Amino acid sequence: MTKKMLNQNAKYDQRFLDKVEPKFEFSNKPINRLKIVKENSVQNKTGKEGRILRLKKKINSIEDCNLRNNSKNLVMGDGDINSPIMLIGEAPDEKEDLEAKTFCGDVGVLLNKMLLAIKIKREKVYSTYSINFRPPNDRKPTTQEIKRYSIFLKEHISIIDPKILILMGTTAMEAVTGLGNQISNERGNWKEIIIGNKTIPVIITFNPSYLIRYPDKKKFSWEDLKKIRKKVEDLNIII
């Protein structure tokens, strides 16, 4: 039989307690009614917004994770949740961890320019990361960490249900496709992955943070961007 918790501030009369049915259990702990309201609000939300909130709660409940324990915030995603284009980066850096947003600072400025170059506004796409928490000292996530978070990432992709996936960086490539090759050998070619019961076109390209460190690679990134623009047109995507 399920036990119920009764919250009382007064001291209990033991004679009364002895007469109470065993299905009741008494506690002096205060009830956090605000937390209950918030949890019920999350559970009651429907559609993509509700599913994302529930996924966020699941990720925030991960135990024994150094990434989660050493980060200030969980970085979930930004942009239009109904966008046909989903952009996946690697992991938050210090600024993104503080602001709980994707692609901030100089990285964000460059990403905006890259998308505008193919006539796409940043706010029209949905962006997230392969890893939702900042790795210590911005190190590369380990293979074990990538595998652990890829479960949540694929659920995230399934919720957004995009028509095109853009993977920026080796971590994103490994998390979504399982490929561990050099990104220079995989970038620029359209592939297909199956998430749930849907096949999604995927292209791998360099992360903007990498392009800031190695600007000579921008010429390859431009070739990838042109292929993305063509795919948008071929699929008659309005964005």
Regions found by a protein language model. Name each.
Residues 1-15:
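Long terminal accessory regions outside catalytic cores
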Residues 12, 16-19, 24-239:
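A polyanion-binding, active-site-adjacent surface
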